[in-house]
Curated annotation (Swiss-Prot):
Compositional bias segments (type: Basic and acidic residues): 1-12, 19-30
GO molecular function, one term: hormone activity
Alphabetically ordered keywords of this record: Cleavage on pair of basic residues, Hormone, Secreted
Signal peptide boundaries: none
Entry's family note: Belongs to the glucagon family.
Protein's UniProt name: Pro-glucagon
Listed SMART domains: GLUCA
Region (Disordered): 1-35
Additional remarks: X's in the sequence were included by homology with American goosefish sequences.
Length: 96
């Protein structure tokens, strides 16, 4: 009789644990979906703000030259970083 009571108590505990997992799964999914949607919204908003900033600053010709120089500098930095990564990868592989 004692074993039957223990068994039914364990079954009830398993059922409660299963229900808790089922309840937390949709919550985690909905939180993840919200975070993903909100991140996409923020990314779109930043892009819109950037385009608006470009439109507003395009009126000044001096700003266009600065933007070109900034772009060139950013590309140069990226290419330099990429060359360093490639060199380190070759060092690791023993090809140098």
């Amino acid at each position: 009789l004692q074993d039957a009571e223990d068994s039914s108590r364990f079954d009830a505990d398993d059922t409660l644990a299963g229900e808790a997992r089922e309840l937390s799964t949709p919550k985690x999914h909905s939180e993840g979906t919200f975070s993903n949607d909100y991140s996409k919204y923020l990314e779109t908003r930043r892009a819109q703000d950037f385009v608006q900033w470009l439109k507003n600053s395009x009126x000044x010709x001096x700003x266009x030259x600065h933007a070109d120089g900034t772009f060139t500098s950013d590309v140069s930095s990226y290419l330099n970083d990429q060359a360093i990564k490639d060199f380190v990868a070759k060092l690791k592989s023993g090809k140098v």
